[in-house]
Amino acid sequence: MNGRSTVPGLLRQRAADTPDAVALCHPDGSTLTFGQWDRSTDALAAALAADGLRVGQRVALLFDEREWFGFATAFCGVLRAGGVAVPLSARLPPGQLVDRVTVAGAVGTIREGCAVPPELGGWQRGPADADANADAVPDRATPAGPAQIIFTSGTEGSARPVVATHGNLTHGHDATPGRRQLAHSRHFLHAFPLGTNAAQTMLLTGLTAEPAALVMPRFDAAEVGAAVEEFRVGTLFLVPAMARELLDSGELHSRDLSSVVLVGTTGDVLPGSVARALAEALPYATIVNTYSSTEAAPARTTMVFDSRRPDAVGRGRVRITDDAGREVPTGEVGHVWIGSAAPPRRYLDGGDTGTFRDGWTRTGDRGRLDDEGYLHLAGRDSSTIHTGGTTVSPFTVEQALREHPDVRDCAVTALADPVLGERPAAVLVTRTGAVPADLRTFLAGRLSGAEIPQRVVCVAALPRNDGGKVVVRALRDLFPPVGSTATAAPVTVVERHLADIWATVLGVAAVGRDDDFLALGGNSMSALRLARLVADQFAVPTPVSALYARPGLAEQAAWIADRIADSP
């Protein structure tokens, strides 16, 4: 008897215990009870088995985000029939959908409410294309058998398919009365997109939690605020990007959200400044951030926000190792591994590349443990910036940027540099829509010279995927090539003379008043030469630090003019 060790077994147990309890609900008031969910699952499983679905065969699930009830039925129906579900996002371009179905080896697709690319192979059906009066079918799933294939976020490269067994998905879930999660709430709310690991976690939570799951088709700050107020939501699940949007929208202050006692964030690191603002806006709520990955789940760390260590992501089964896999001393940065007693996940293609080892999963992040065992992240392995022999963590730079009062959101990436190899560059979302004039001076007191971004651009919003994570590979495209945009000609006498010096030092034909010395290829050696020539030309002491603090031609010229005016 599989019982609680398979996903459909959990559903069967919950339907037997509380058949009329609401499992899922929509903001429009529609509901799906556990009894209805179980019966529709039986009907679909019987139809799939009758049509010849074999144990272990894979079935793609493609649903409009308003069709959570149908998705829940399809997911459990495929699993009860012994199949493997492949949840996909309807937001994906048709070509990517076809690629993922092909890579996963799906024999067919269950879809509802969205178009299916004509190139998609295999059979197609809807979740309701089954006999609603079908008898209960035996659960053909086993704890050790595969249950789902979910794709990683693909923010830095190609998304990879990850296989999870029933034992992995059900680990830690208990639908027994008195042991159900979130018993302090009548509803828990989320707006995680279908096809993501976060959405799958919410589906499993809905099977075993005490409250009903209030599912939002898409995240909209005003709609979430209204739903929380109307349904008196007790638990709110977000990704950090959603939390920022809620804070910026004013919804947390304009509505009665006093029912919220728990805010859980996942999918990315919750910045301390955002956690602090949430705690102030929702004084009755505990703010909790969960750190994990698609590959590592259900292994995780959990951190209740603590103003004494705002950037920690919690404690748990965590190891920090060097490149050879040896554990490093406390406080030293290395590769982050998190462990769990659950059956591990694996990549579908078997190319584990050192990710999975003896119950431990390498997350792809770098981090350190402090003296009390709290984990502090230092960025992605693949995002580390190597500039002139110095290693720069984008995560560290982003933390400093977020401390600026005008910066709402930010991301840091590496741009190629002909001398230093790479340089950090920042993409900002600011309250004014422009790069703060004092940004470099502000960062100079918080970061080393190598860590200060040498190019900065402002955008309306960062490029993010369905799960709210920044698409790192898209950041570089936001920076125009050096010299590709014309800038205004120097205006003042000082600007014109300084532009001539820049042209000599940098070996460029022309310099505009809006140009940036570092963006045009300036480095520490050329900055030294620039400082000497400026001192000779204008007869003012010129420390290199003054030039680094203001790399624009116009701002350097203004600084020089002020020094000249102050001269006796």
Show where each model-derived region lies.
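Conserved structural elements of the adenylate-forming
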Residues: 38-46, 143, 162-183, 191, ...
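Conserved AMP-binding A3 loop
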Residues: 31-35, 147-174
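Conserved AMP-binding/adenylation subdomain of ANL enzymes
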Residues: 170-187, 195-235, 249
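Conserved AMP-binding/adenylate-forming core of the ANL superfamily
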Residues: 3, 20-52, 60-69, 76, ...
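Conserved ATP/PPi-binding loop(s) of AMP-dependent carboxylate-activating enzymes
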Residues: 312-315, 326-358, 374, 390-392, ...
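Gly/Ser/Thr-rich phosphate-binding loop
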Residues: 235-237, 251-309, 327
